[in-house]
Design a protein with these regions (language model features):
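PLP-dependent aminotransferase class I/II
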Residues: 193-273
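Conserved PLP-binding catalytic core of the aspartate aminotransferase-like
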Residues: 256, 263-296, 307-313
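Conserved core of the PLP fold type I
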Residues: 57-164, 175-191, 195, 317
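PLP-dependent enzyme catalytic core of the Aspartate aminotransferase-like
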Residues: 155, 301, 305-331
């Protein structure tokens, strides 16, 4: 057996090292690693279709024409369904375009630095790659560009297509939602050699679904359709993507404002950062900035010409800004970032009080993850919490440190505690169980916790740890917390308690006028 030879000097796509690899390389723990390298949102998109229904059909192949998805993409893009070709992410469609327009004896053009997959797809088809577009069979255009973030006006791209009618001009618009909607899609009629690629991995937050789509003139789309795989997108992914395109729920305005804040901070200390129209910031530098950041557990995408920093939550962006010597301006909103490492635990926590209940918790203790997810969801907080502890001993240190960190995060996010409702209370029935919770956010740390459990453990969690952990939460948050819960099922007793606390916190942190609400005049 002999594989087909690759061009001399061929280089495959290389991912950045995993968090585990970074941690091992620099004597850290994986929980200490923050990633700024994937150009995806810090929180996932929210599926708008019943997942249970989709998963119940895992034994079936997807509907081969992807009609529902193509119609949704067409409506979102302002074209006809016959102009849409779908694929497993824009990467799959890049390969499809190369398969359609390139081959031995053909040539593609690009303008580096840009997305490396254009080079790889070109060479895998046995074609040549050059910078000069004259005589090219395919011209790759990343717009906005990755990794520099720069934007070419759609009219200029259309002029390029008209100047090279023999070439397919493939415009990768993976980040167009961050560029104020600047797109070449309306120009397909006047420049039929244009092909526009898009993805749901960026603004939509569905990178793991691997869904992308191409827009082209009907005859060009037909050529692409002939060369795509029979069923490149999983059925559940296609249904989630179609629903998201029909009713987009992302909001890039906050990302754009944060992008400008981060760039301004870097410009303020002398870094060379061009204007960017994406969800990342490009820093031109020949210094080993990426290596220095990685030593601190901060992973950016490294290039010969500089580094690319993906935007995360504002408080997390401040971490990388300070590591680069920049003094960030005040972050928008009410957020917090907590990182803590001891000989017993390592954890990091990102909290946004003005979120929508998007939660990712991974502590290594399944039932604790479940309870914290309930608390954050019912409080309408966005929470990401990753922790690793000495679970080989027992779960005590992890449970206590996680709740303490959550309290620290709440205190940090509340700041001066001005303009909040201050008080919150809730009663939650959970089948036979019933819980009540009351919260006072003024700086009077106190806790009264009464959880009536009938056994020692649920789901690998020692229930006796929960009262003390909630006390630590109250002390670190510097607030008063009362929680009572009782019932016949210990699982329900615990769930009701954390749901009630979440509901009470939701009320207490809500905007409630100016100052701190207190008849004493000062709190």
């Amino acid at each position: 057996m002999k594989a087909r030879a690759l061009p001399d000097g061929f280089a495959a796509y290389v991912w950045a090292p995993s968090s585990a690899e970074v941690a091992e390389r620099h004597g850290l723990r994986p929980e200490q690693v923050l990633r700024y390298d994937q150009n995806t949102p810090p929180v996932p998109g929210v599926p708008q279709v019943p997942l249970a229904e989709s998963f119940a059909r895992l034994n079936e192949y997807p509907e081969g024409t992807y009609r529902e998805l193509r119609e949704a993409a067409a409506a979102y893009s302002g074209v006809e369904p016959e102009q849409v070709v779908v694929g497993a992410g824009a990467d799959d469609l890049i390969a499809t375009c190369a398969r359609t327009f390139l081959g031995p004896g053909r040539r593609a053009a690009w303008n580096p630095p840009t997305y490396a997959l254009y080079r790889i797809a070109t060479h895998l088809e046995g074609a040549e790659l050059a910078v000069e577009p004259d005589g090219a069979d395919l011209i790759w255009v990343c717009n906005p560009n990755n990794p520099t973030g720069e934007l070419v006006a759609p009219e200029e791209v259309a002029a390029l297509a008209r100047a090279h009618p023999q070439a397919a001009v493939v415009v990768d618009e993976a980040y167009f939602e961050y560029a104020g909607g600047a797109t070449c899609a309306p120009l397909l009629a006047e420049a039929p050699n244009l092909v526009v690629l898009r993805t749901l991995s960026k603004a939509f937050g569905f990178a793991s679904l691997r869904v992308g789509y191409a827009l082209a003139a009907p005859e060009v789309a037909a050529h692409l359709e002939l060369r795509r795989a029979p069923a490149p997108i999983a059925g559940p992914a296609a249904r989630i993507a179609a629903a998201a395109l029909r009713e987009p729920r992302f909001d890039v305005a906050g990302d754009v404002a944060e992008r400008d804040r981060v760039r301004d901070a870097l410009l303020g200390v002398g870094y060379d950062c061009p204007a960017t129209f994406t969800n990342f910031v490009w820093v031109r530098s020949d210094e080993p900035l990426g290596e220095r950041l990685e030593e601190q557990g901060l992973v950016v995408r490294r290039f010969a010409e500089g580094i690319r920093i993906t935007l995360r939550r504002p408080t997390e962006n401040d971490v990388v800004l300070r590591a680069l010597g920049a003094e960030p301006g005040p972050p928008p909103g009410r957020g917090a970032y907590v990182a803590r490492t001891t000989t017993e635990t390592a954890l990091r926590l990102s909290l946004d009080l003005d979120g929508s209940g998007r939660v990712r918790v991974a502590t290594g203790i399944g039932f604790l993850d479940h309870l914290l997810t309930l608390l954050a969801f019912h409080a309408a907080f966005d929470l990401e919490l990753v922790a690793g502890g000495d679970l080989d001993v027992d779960e005590h240190h992890t449970v206590e440190d996680v709740l303490a960190a959550l309290g620290d995060g709440l205190a940090q996010a509340l700041g001066a505690r001005e303009g909040v409702a201050r008080y919150g209370s809730a009663t939650v029935p959970m089948d036979e169980a019933r819980a009540t919770a009351a919260v006072d956010l003024v700086r009077r740390p106190h806790a009264e916790i009464a959880l009536a459990f009938g056994s020692d453990r649920v789901g690998g969690l020692a229930l006796t740890l929960l009262p003390h952990a909630l006390e630590r939460f109250a002390m670190q948050a510097c607030c008063t917390v009362h929680v009572e819960s009782a019932g016949r099922d210990d699982h329900h007793v615990a769930e009701a308690a954390f749901k009630a606390l979440g509901q009470a916190l939701r009320q207490a942190v809500a905007p409630g006028g100016a100052g701190v609400r207190s008849t004493k005049g000062e709190a």
